[in-house]
UniProtKB/Swiss-Prot annotation:
This is Type II pantothenate kinase. The gene is coaW. It catalyses: (R)-pantothenate + ATP = (R)-4'-phosphopantothenate + ADP + H(+). The keyword ATP-binding applies. The lineage of its organism: Bacteria, Bacillati, Bacillota, Bacilli, Bacillales. It is found in: Cytoplasm. It comes from Staphylococcus haemolyticus (strain JCSC1435). GO terms for cellular component: cytosol. Its EC number is 2.7.1.33. Catalyzes the phosphorylation of pantothenate (Pan), the first step in CoA biosynthesis.
Length: 266
């Protein structure tokens, strides 16, 4: 059995692979001591680590482990998952949406980091808490799914009420820009959270398609743990990517790209 671990700032992603198959598991980074104890209590053919807390795990193991650069590991694992899921694209931007978001260009041979932005799961959870007092990510994203952004976000269609707009009416003109026009409305926690997910998704997409245009590719691949239990984020990102004329790809188990890639870089 080989094990690959991507120890991030919020979550630890674990992939185990053998001739019998592959398994995926997630642990909170606050439980890193449990992961270390589990590794020390079992025997593995190899232990491959990546992510910001990889060093913490490695220095507490009773056996040797190999640490790989997170970006290279994610690129390797993503390439495998793309092929396994039938996506045969040679070059693309990939956005790794974790606590924050890192953007990379893959040219068919290697990845190059081309940018990043502080919006991601951390903003959803942090700003989401400030607006709703909900600390649990799953409860927060569950509530966001039922929200309506129309009374909070100002869209192009709200500005061009009686005339044909020069750009698609569903585009957001100003996130949270419709609030002062609707002060007589009860802004429910669900609507607030939906708008938080909306701004996160739109900022990530805008950054991703900007670097896609700069690198002359129409393909944008989205991975990361922020999509866990968050179909609204996926919907916002995919719809906005298409609306801007690019091709979005969402990869199942994409959050485990780093852990999987670390195994195969070893």
């Amino acid at each position: 059995m080989k094990v690959g671990i991507d120890a991030g700032g919020t979550l630890i992603k674990i992939v185990q692979e053998s001739q019998q198959g592959r398994s995926y598991e997630t642990k909170l980074t606050t439980n890193i001591s449990e992961v270390i104890a589990w590794l020390n209590a079992n025997t593995f053919e190899s232990i491959s680590l990546t992510g910001g807390n990889a060093g913490v795990i490695a220095e507490n193991l009773n056996v040797d482990a190999t640490i790989f650069v997170e970006f290279d590991a994610s690129s390797k694992g993503l390439g495998m998952l793309l092929k396994e899921q039938g996506h045969h694209i040679d070059e693309y931007i990939f956005a790794n949406v974790g606590t924050g978001t890192s953007l990379h260009y893959f040219d068919g041979k290697q990845q190059r980091r081309v940018g990043g932005v502080g919006t991601g799961g951390g903003m959803i959870q942090g700003l989401g808490y400030l607006l709703s007092q909900i600390t649990d990510y799953e409860a927060l994203t569950n509530l966001a799914q039922s929200g309506d952004r129309d009374t909070i976000d100002l869209k192009v269609k709200h500005i061009y009420k009686d005339t044909e707009p020069p750009i698609p009416g569903e585009l957001t003109a100003a996130n949270f820009g419709n609030v002062l026009h609707n002060l007589d409305v009860d802004f429910s926690p669900a609507n607030k959270l939906a708008s938080v997910v909306g701004v996160v998704g739109e900022v990530i997409t805008t950054m991703a398609i900007t670097v896609a245009r700069e690198n002359k590719t129409e393909n944008v691949v989205y991975i990361g743990s922020s999509f866990n239990n968050n179909p609204l984020l996926r919907e916002v990102i995919e719809d906005y990517t298409v609306l801007r004329g690019f091709k979005p790809y969402y990869i199942e188990n994409g959050a485990f790209s780093g852990a999987l890639g670390a195994i195969y870089l070893n």
